[in-house]
């Protein structure tokens, strides 16, 4: 029988899927109200949460425009920015005792990876057209097309695995690290581990956001656009 750490969701059910879903919804609700608080009373000179959110948005767009250009960075920000913020909040909630990171569940990170996967292919087909988009999978050398096309297909599907497992593995490992530290030193406040987990939570959200933009750039930017 698999051993699970007790969380507040266990008051309602011990089912693994329920616990994951509980924290997925809880994270979304927390993110919604925090974001609402940041945008409720907008000021010309940003302060408090508004200042934090504007700094985050500026930082994301500053990095993204070097990948995909400023216009497309802003166009795809609603997806990439929302995913980045949600992944960040999901990572952070697991630091709180009695809570569990949704991103510590592979089933959830798989859903995020599939959203990115299907969306960038949809955008690539929409921008370039179905045949032109998939023609790129065959490569520039025609006689190599029978070899390159299946390799490219496998490469794109492997992105689902790499995106989901990278996030899941890192956050699951971080949660286990924190649990071990709390068990070894329950009488002390493990400030250093909390700081490490906070930094790792930011880093994983940043990596997921960057890869989202990289995949979108590969799908929508034609040779003429480079």
Curated annotation (Swiss-Prot):
UniProt keyword annotations, A-Z: ATP synthesis, Cell inner membrane, Cell membrane, CF(0), Hydrogen ion transport, Ion transport, Membrane, Transmembrane, Transmembrane helix, Transport
Gene Ontology biological-process entries: proton motive force-driven plasma membrane ATP synthesis
Statement: the UniProt record of this protein carries the keyword Nuclease: no
Matching InterPro entries: ATP_syn_F0_a_bact/chloroplast, ATP_synth_F0_asu, ATP_synth_F0_asu_AS, F0_ATP_A_sf
Positions of transmembrane segments: 18-38, 79-99, 105-125, 134-154, 179-199, 201-221
Membrane topology, from the record: Multi-pass membrane protein
Principal cellular location given in the protein's record: membrane
Gene3D superfamilies, per the entry: ATP synthase, F0 complex, subunit A
Compartments (UniProt record): Cell inner membrane
GO MF entries: proton-transporting ATP synthase activity, rotational mechanism
GO cellular component, one term: plasma membrane
Subunit structure: F-type ATPases have 2 components, CF(1) - the catalytic core - and CF(0) - the membrane proton channel. CF(1) has five subunits: alpha(3), beta(3), gamma(1), delta(1), epsilon(1). CF(0) has three main subunits: a(1), b(2) and c(9-12). The alpha and beta chains form an alternating ring which encloses part of the gamma chain. CF(1) is attached to CF(0) by a central stalk formed by the gamma and epsilon chains, while a peripheral stalk is formed by the delta and b chains.
Family: Belongs to the ATPase A chain family.
Role played: Key component of the proton channel; it plays a direct role in the translocation of protons across the membrane.
Name of the featured protein: ATP synthase subunit a
